[in-house]
């Protein structure tokens, strides 16, 4: 199963094995670790999301809310690990100028100042230092495999807290020796990427700073350990993802009233649109006892709406929360590709005759568009200005190519017309943009309707040849997301279709039309 946007698209009839207890426990432990630390995050910037209701309805117990949140957390984490090959835990430093960051620095500095004062006192006070070594011992032991081994016994022997307390009573604790042993042990069990940190620790001369840096590196080592676990369990999670995610979501639905409200509304919009369309085409169908809708067609139309979704203002259906960041990124890339295709179409229509036979020029113009349209989905981006710049540079490149061939350059009127038409692409309902939108939607719809046995890509509609390679890559990523979503949530969609259509005789057709595994 390609989970990270490979060229091969996921087919809808892909099977999933049953959930195993080892997998569930592994995901739960990862989720618990992530919640308890609260300092790690995913590099894909995925946010934990909950169903649309912002406050629990009356009668919903707090325990139910927490249970649903736990299931959502486990499900989201498992999904992210499975579909995102780059997923890893990483330290999330507080903003330097934030209140929380300042409070943290002040409190930590106060602790280390007290420790330094205690160790410098006559006689030295070891209470805080002993607590630190006790915590260090537990962290080191957590890196080792369960069961007895020589290193485990050695750590317990050297960092024997009872013995250290006895030594402290006689002011005979070798703090430097204990710290050196800890650093040596860390060097034996850390990942190679931490070797430089270990060398820096060994070069530190101030004992308090050394202890401070030991904890910093131990935190990094714990992060490395969790990422190692994630890499190793990823194939297992991928193998069981469909069944596991479906079962977890079922628990959320059972624990949370109206857990599918946004999903129901999402499907209802497409059903109403299809029914209205059928009535317009064949008014007699209005009196038919059974809707002639294809649930799979309606569902595909729902997925297509996600390509033009307002991710800043509209809430996603609950069944798509885990893929929200991926869908938003895909939609933004597709929007930029559409604008590139629009620019190429207008340019070709206006000056194509004089630039025919210059493929390198077409590639240069495409690169110019890609560079100047970078970041066009940001609110601060000035699209009109970018399109004007593209028009000016396009004219310059075309004139340069014509001069090299000894041909007349574009006159001022043609150049002004070209720049003006390109600048008008930012206007709402621009006919060229509308046309390209329809063709991209047609291409994506064709991808979703591909038989599972077909491995080749559908033909690219006219005008999209300039972005064919990029469109195929995004199309496969989109199809992978959609087909996995159908496998996981097919039974939930079928139940919603039943309720919306109120047709008992249609139930069998609906069940047969939607993938459930």
Curated annotation (Swiss-Prot):
Q: Which GO terms describe its cellular component?
A: cytoplasm; cytoskeleton
Keyword Glycoprotein in annotation: no
Q: Name one GO biological process term.
A: muscle cell migration
**Taxonomy, superkingdom:** Eukaryota
UniProt KW GTP-binding keyword: no
Which spans does this entry mark as compositional bias, Low complexity? 36-55
Parts forming coiled coils: none
Q: Where is this region: Disordered?
A: 1-59
InterPro entries, per the entry: Tcp11 (IPR008862)
Entry-linked PANTHER family: T-COMPLEX PROTEIN 11-LIKE PROTEIN 2, TESTIS-SPECIFIC PROTEIN PBS13 T-COMPLEX 11
The protein here is known as T-complex protein 11-like protein 2
Q: Which organism is it from?
A: Mus musculus (Mouse)
The subcellular localization recorded is: Cytoplasm, Cytoskeleton
Give the matching Pfam families: Tcp11 (PF05794)
Subunit structure, interactors included: Interacts with FMNL2; this interaction promotes muscle-derived satellite cell (MDSC) migration and differentiation.
The family classification in the record reads:
Belongs to the TCP11 family.
């Amino acid at each position: 199963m390609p989970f990270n946007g490979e060229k091969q698209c996921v087919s809808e009839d892909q099977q999933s094995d049953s959930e195993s207890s080892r997998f569930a426990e592994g995901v739960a432990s990862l989720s618990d670790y992530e919640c308890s630390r609260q300092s790690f995050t995913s590099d894909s910037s995925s946010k934990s999301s909950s169903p649309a209701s912002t406050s629990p309805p009356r009668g919903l117990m707090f325990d139910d809310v927490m249970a649903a949140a736990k299931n959502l957390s486990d499900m989201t984490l498992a999904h992210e690990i499975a579909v995102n090959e780059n997923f890893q835990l990483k330290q999330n430093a507080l903003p330097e100028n934030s209140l929380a960051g300042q409070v943290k620095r002040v409190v930590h500095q106060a602790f280390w100042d007290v420790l330094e004062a205690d160790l410098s006192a006559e006689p030295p006070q070891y209470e805080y230092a002993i607590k630190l070594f006790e915590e260090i011992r537990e962290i080191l032991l957590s890196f080792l495999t369960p069961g007895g081994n020589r290193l485990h016994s050695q750590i317990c022997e050297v960092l024997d807290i009872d013995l250290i307390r006895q030594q402290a009573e006689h002011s005979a604790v070798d703090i430097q020796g204990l710290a050196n042993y800890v650093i040596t042990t860390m060097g034996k069990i850390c990942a190679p990427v931490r070797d430089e940190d270990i060398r820096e620790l060994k070069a530190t001369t101030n004992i308090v700073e050394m202890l401070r840096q030991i904890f910093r590196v131990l935190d990094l080592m714990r992060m490395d350990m969790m990422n190692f676990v994630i890499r190793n369990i990823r194939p297992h999670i991928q193998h069981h993802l469909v069944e596991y995610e479906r079962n977890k979501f079922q628990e959320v639905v059972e624990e949370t009233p109206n857990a599918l409200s946004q999903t129901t509304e999402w499907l209802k919009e497409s059903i109403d649109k299809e029914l209205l369309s059928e009535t317009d085409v064949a008014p007699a169908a209005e009196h038919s006892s059974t809707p002639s809708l294809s649930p799979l067609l309606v569902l595909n139309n729902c997925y297509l709406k996600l390509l033009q979704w307002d991710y800043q203002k509209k809430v996603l259906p609950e069944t798509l929360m885990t893929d929200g960041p991926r869908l938003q990124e895909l939609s933004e890339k597709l929007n930029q590709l559409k604008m590139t295709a629009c620019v190429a179409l207008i340019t070709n229509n206006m000056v194509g005759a004089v630039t025919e036979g210059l493929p390198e020029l077409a590639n240069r113009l495409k690169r110019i568009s890609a560079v100047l349209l970078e970041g066009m989905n940001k609110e601060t981006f000035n699209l009109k200005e970018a399109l004007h710049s593209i028009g000016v540079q396009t004219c310059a490149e075309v004139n340069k190519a014509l001069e090299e061939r000894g041909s007349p350059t574009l006159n001022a009127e043609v150049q002004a017309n070209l720049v003006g038409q390109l600048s008008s692409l930012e206007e709402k309902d621009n006919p060229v943009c509308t046309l390209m939108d329809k063709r991209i939607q047609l291409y994506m719809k064709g991808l979703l309707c591909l038989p599972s046995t077909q491995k080749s890509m559908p033909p690219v509609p006219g005008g999209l040849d300039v972005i064919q390679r990029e469109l195929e890559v995004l199309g496969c990523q989109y199809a992978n997301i959609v087909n996995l979503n159908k496998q996981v949530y097919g039974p939930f969609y079928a139940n919603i279709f039943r309720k919306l259509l109120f047709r008992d005789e249609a139930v069998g057709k609906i069940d047969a039309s939607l993938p459930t595994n």
